[in-house]
Amino acid sequence: MNLPRAERPRSTPQRSLRDSDGEDGKIDVLGEEEDEDEVEDEEEEARQQFLEQSLQPGLQVARWGGVALPREHIEGGGGPSDPSEFGTKFRAPPRSAAASEDARQPAKPPYSYIALITMAILQNPHKRLTLSGICAFISGRFPYYRRKFPAWQNSIRHNLSLNDCFVKIPREPGHPGKGNYWSLDPASQDMFDNGSFLRRRKRFKRHQLTPGAHLPHPFPLPAAHAALHNPHPGPLLGAPAPPQPVPGAYPNTAPGRRPYALLHPHPLRYLLLSARVYAGAPKKAEGADLATPAPFPCCSPHLVLSLGRRARVWRRHREADASLSALRVLCKGSGERVQGLRRVCPRPRGATATCSSDHQACCIPKPLPLCCKCPPPLLLGQFCSNSSSIRRTAPTAALPPRARCWAGTCRPRRRC
């Protein structure tokens, strides 16, 4: 930077003077040289002050030959810059603590939540675990899940509830504790390809129960309840058909073994117990005394017990027909006819009585011939005798009019 410098005084030639003796002598001029050094020092101090003022923060204005210039122009003119500011601008930022923690965190395992749950269940000797046991196995086996425990625990719970390959098992009596057990469905053993937990086949779906299939009950049910639970009882008074196994749900087993014992090596008595079946059993038990699963070979197979609208009709007249439940029916060899028989069962082939379908509660009463092919609906559980006539030992006078008609003692002209 060119700054105006003060003019130096011209040095005067040394004059020779003669002393008193007449000899020429030189005069010492050291005082002039000291003045020049002081001027140079003052210029250096002024220059340093100017540079310090130009480097102060904010917009500075410097006087340069009477012209006001901003600080940026002064610095861009080639002036020296502060080395401390240069170091802060181009210094590398320090590494954050979060980045260092991420570098030390273990990698996430390449397994899905279904694979992790399957690993936990299979390593257990009883092949079943609670939710807390599954989470404890995963966090102990894979360090990645130790720090994010609350987040992935919810994912484990959702996968257990939403996937059909996992079955909830209630706790057995006498084994207190918190939470239910979770196990694998027997049909989902080959869920993973070649036993590798990295590759899973298509989503497993549990087989829906067919109409003729039966759920295995942990406790034996009465005969009436078993008949009510069967959606298709088949012949009304015939022998109950054996339960048909669900196709694909259970493996083939030897005869005489319980099907629910094959679901797992340990007892799973409450695996497929349906609460809705037991909830509807008391309501259906009212009509259980109307039909008993006893063999009745002489009856037509077309007679099927209706537990719908016709069952409600039976309950209406149950009090009036209570005394008729023990009567025997006149069978072969008897030519008598029963008057005023109200049809409740479906119409067999060749019957003359017809049933209206316009939401009527009962059928049209018409006389029907008495034979073994169409027994009275209220006596479905009685055996048909081969004798010509069997009458009740009690006197018929004590019976209501309808009962006397059933016994064949009323007049033909009178209709009950």
Curated annotation (Swiss-Prot):
Location of the protein in the cell: Nucleus
GO cellular component: chromatin; nucleus
Residues covered by region (Disordered): 1-55, 70-105
Gene it is expressed from: FOXD4L4
Keyword annotations: DNA-binding, Nucleus, Transcription, Transcription regulation
TM regions (residue ranges): none
Biased composition annotated in UniProt, kind: Acidic residues: 30-45
Protein name: Forkhead box protein D4-like 4
